[in-house]
Structures are given as C-alpha cells and as structure tokens.
Amino acid sequence: MKLSLVIPCYNEQDNVELFYNTATEVFKDKGFDYELIFVNDGSRDQTMDKLRHIYEIADENVKVVGFSRNFGKESAIYAGLKESRGEMVCLIDADMQQRPELVLDMMAILDKDPNYDAVACYQEDRRESKVLSAFKDCFYKIINKTSEIEFKSGASDFRLLRRCVVDAVLSMSEYHRFSKGIFSWVGFNTYYMPYIVEDRANGTSK
C-alpha cells in the first residue's frame, strides 16, 4: 500500500522543513510506502528554496510542484492530486495545525471499514471568535438548505481519500473548483472525524 500526502504551501518558509521532518518521523517503519507532494502556490518568501533543499536531501518519495504565481489553494490541491500515486491520498496543510500523526488514525478507519471511502476531519474545538463561529454556522445552514448535497459544519480540506475518490474528483471538468463541494458531490461514503486544530508552528494564517 502507498500513501500520498498532498501539501499546499503558500509563504510557509518557516514550516515546510518542520513538516517534512515530522512526517518523516511519523511514517517511517510503518510497513507502507509514502510520498510527500509539496505544491508551492506562488509563495513570495523562501518557501521554494526550502522545498528545493528538502528535495535534494530527501529520498525519492518527495515531489515538489511549483506555480509561477499564486493560483489559490484549490488549484494547489488539484495539482497535488494529479501528481499523487497512492492508493490512499491525504490533503494536509504545511503549517502543522493539522498534525501528521492524525493521518494514521484516518488510515485505521478506512482499513477497518471498507464501506467508507474517505475520512474528513472537522473542528471539534474551534479556537476562534464567537462571531466567526456564528457566521460559519449560518453559512452552512444556508448552503445546506439551498444545495442538493449536504456540507458538514466545521469540515476542512484535511481528509484522506481512497484512490477511487481521487479519480472521481480528477474526472470533473470544473474550472472554478470548490473542493469541499466536489468531495460531497462525487457521492462516496465519508466518515467525519473530529480533531482539534493546533496553533500554527510559525507565521500567521493565510
């Protein structure tokens, strides 16, 4: 079995090496192959230089995709999915707010129950203002009333997908992509796993 991690990066010069070192420690000697796919989304800092260094010192399990300018996280996710080769593919941020260790828990869920094709993480403890939380709750209530598909409140892009889900997502031709909507639209059974969003290791939220 092979696991692919797709890691969008925008101005993450202070975090990408920490992420790489942490992920390498988490996934070594676990009995499966894995690859790290870093997608530099037109960063204006030294993120690309740091990624080049990682690529030079790493084994062959590291890929780096670089955009000429900032196209946005949705485009970075799509590019990473296209590069992925794993039977399971995880979308995870580079800022360490989503801990790589949690991916093992997500994998265990899919290994245990073949009826699920994806694990999506949602924020159990929102470390944000009451106003922002209320706004988000209102957004999900409105969109669920007006949409044919249901969106889980607090769900993030942090998720693990079987290859069949990845292939279905890549087959869709939408130019302006909304990943959470697409993941719901393709219709595979999803397990929602609560998690606590950690503080950023370095820098500020994008």
Positions of PLM-derived features:
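Donor nucleotide-sugar binding loop of glycosyltransferases
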Residues: E12-N15, S43, R99
